[in-house]
Design a protein with these regions (language model features):
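Amphipathic alpha-helical packing segments from all-alpha helical-bundle domains
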Residues: 59-62, 105-132, 137-148, 172
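Amphipathic alpha-helical interaction segments
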Residues: 6, 77-85, 141-148, 172, ...
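C-terminal peripheral helix-coil segments that are non-catalytic and often amphipathic
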Residues: 114, 118-130, 159-203
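Basic, helix-initiating cap at the start of DNA-binding domains
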Residues: 1-18, 25-31, 47-52, 60
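Short linear capping/connector segments at secondary-structure termini
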Residues: 98-106, 196-199
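Short, charged helix-capping/linker segments at alpha-helix termini
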Residues: 21-22, 133
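Short hydrophobic/aromatic patch on the recognition helix
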Residues: 32-43
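Hydrophobic alpha-helical connector segments
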Residues: 52, 63-92, 96, 105-108, ...
């Protein structure tokens, strides 16, 4: 079991950095300091090892989701907290970043976002029913916003983590973006506030 865990961790780091096609069992064997024979004993193919990494990353994600949901906060607050927790996982958990990349690069894999998007949509439907959202803030649109925020967080992390330049954490950045989304950026209550005809909903 210890060898299997070591291999999954080593594979996660390699898949996260180089992707599925750019990673070999020999490469993982070298990083894990485990013979190729032992590697293939536990995982006869790279695909099976990738499946194990994907399953582990998804399990970590689902466990984190369950923890957030167990707090039983108002629906909109739960959506915000859930998105921040998912951003934290992307930043701190290599196996989760690896699972995200593998789900995108391998044919036939379920997208990582499919683990949490239905929950986000359900919570936003509830938030709308409870009056926590403006009438024109449709749950479907806010769900898309959450998806874009987290997609942007992953892109931001991937661009920054491969450099030596200091960068802001994704969670702190996402908190500020949520503040903008919830409070708004337009001074609509001030004289001379701009209008945005291009953003008007179609009749």
């Amino acid at each position: 079991m210890r060898t299997r865990t070591t291999l999954i961790r080593a594979a996660a780091a390699e898949f996260d950095r180089d992707g599925y096609d750019g990673t070999s069992l020999a490469q993982i064997s070298k990083v894990a300091q485990i013979s190729i024979g032992a590697v293939t004993f536990h995982f006869p193919s790279k695909a099976e090892l990738a499946d194990a990494v994907l399953a582990e990353g998804n399990a970590v994600t689902l466990a984190a989701m369950e923890k957030v949901l167990s707090a039983s906060l108002p629906a909109l607050c739960t959506v915000v907290d859930l998105s921040l927790e998912l951003a934290r996982l992307m930043e701190q958990e290599t196996v989760v970043r690896s699972a995200i990349r593998l789900s995108r690069e391998r044919h036939g894999c379920t997208s990582w976002s499919d683990l949490w998007l239905p929950t986000v949509r359900r919570l936003l439907d509830q938030a709308h029913e409870d009056g926590q959202l403006r009438d024109d803030a449709l749950p479907a649109d806010v769900t898309t916003l959450v998806e874009h925020l987290l997609g942007g967080a992953e892109t931001y992390l991937r661009c920054r983590m491969c450099t030596e330049v200091a960068y802001e954490g994704a969670v702190g950045q996402l908190k500020r973006l949520w503040h903008l989304a919830l409070v708004g950026v337009s001074a609509t209550d001030r004289a001379g506030a701009p209008t945005f005809p291009g953003l008007r909903a179609p009749d």
